[in-house]
């Protein structure tokens, strides 16, 4: 469950290390975002000479949450940290690599690129 002011790790090689959620997209009063939801983020920490700089604002898709996701069979998949992948204006990933596992819930038409780049799909 990600809300405004939540900080997330970045799970791609765009150059950003930590981002902060500044808006949950998808409705005028939407409060929380879960896995597969798009949020607006500000880069808080970045590596030198990278594409993403500190202070830049991007769209991002949430790929891992501490809250986790409940499957229809009753199982729950949770993670230790919240993580997101930075997206460009066309909602395509900025980075060319994805770090760490992602969930099967991202297998929509929109995020198949992220699923195919991920080392593990849970």
From Swiss-Prot:
SMART domains: Ribosomal_L14. Coiled coil: none annotated. Gene3D superfamilies: Ribosomal protein L14. InterPro entries: Ribosomal_uL14, Ribosomal_uL14_bac-type, Ribosomal_uL14_CS, Ribosomal_uL14_sf. One of its GO terms (cellular component) is cytosolic large ribosomal subunit. GO terms for molecular function: large ribosomal subunit rRNA binding; structural constituent of ribosome. GO terms for biological process: translation. Keywords: Ribonucleoprotein, Ribosomal protein, RNA-binding, rRNA-binding. It holds the Pfam family Ribosomal_L14. Binds to 23S rRNA. Forms part of two intersubunit bridges in the 70S ribosome. NCBIfam families: rplN_bact (TIGR01067). Belongs to the universal ribosomal protein uL14 family. Part of the 50S ribosomal subunit. Forms a cluster with proteins L3 and L19. In the 70S ribosome, L14 and L19 interact and together make contacts with the 16S rRNA in bridges B5 and B8. This is Large ribosomal subunit protein uL14. It comes from Shewanella sp. (strain ANA-3). The lineage of its organism: Bacteria, Pseudomonadati, Pseudomonadota, Gammaproteobacteria, Alteromonadales. The gene is rplN.
